Amino acid sequence: MKKIIKISFLFVAIFCMTATLQAQKFGYVNSALILSEMPEIKQADSNLEALQKQLMKKGEGMVQLFQKDYAEIQQKVAKGELSPVQQEEQAKNLESRQIEIQKFEQEMQEQMVAKREELYKPIYDKVNDAIKQVAKEGGYQMIFDAATILYGEEGADVSSLVKTKLGI
């Protein structure tokens, strides 16, 4: 009797494990490809490029003005038009402006990163929502990004389903 119970329990356990293994469904998406095809990304890239050009123009203006003033001061020094005290004042002024330019360069990079996050976050959220919808509708337990998959069957690629959800 105990033997029959043990065997029955073993069969039930094996049946449950096989049912669980067969029920799991995995897929993958090529998120980089999906993002590259989205018009929103193209618009965000365009906005970032415009901001970068604007900031670069301002930075270049600051550098050109600095170089012009530096050249003028050097000419005055060469002609003997500046006293040692005035030379020191001008040197301090140029040094503070150089620090200002360096700060601007750092702020420019920070602005670009912040703007990129601001523009891309809603797009990434939209793609993630579409992936979640496809997963729920298709009964997928997990969907991976193709960038992390070394091999995957073509049938497991749900990129086209996600593109359809996104309207691309």
What would you call each of these model-derived segments?
Residues M1-F9:
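Bacterial N-terminal signal peptides that target proteins for export
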Residues M17-A23:
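Sec/Tat signal peptide C-region and signal peptidase I cleavage site
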Residues S159:
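Short beta-strand-centered segments that line the small-molecule binding cleft or hinge
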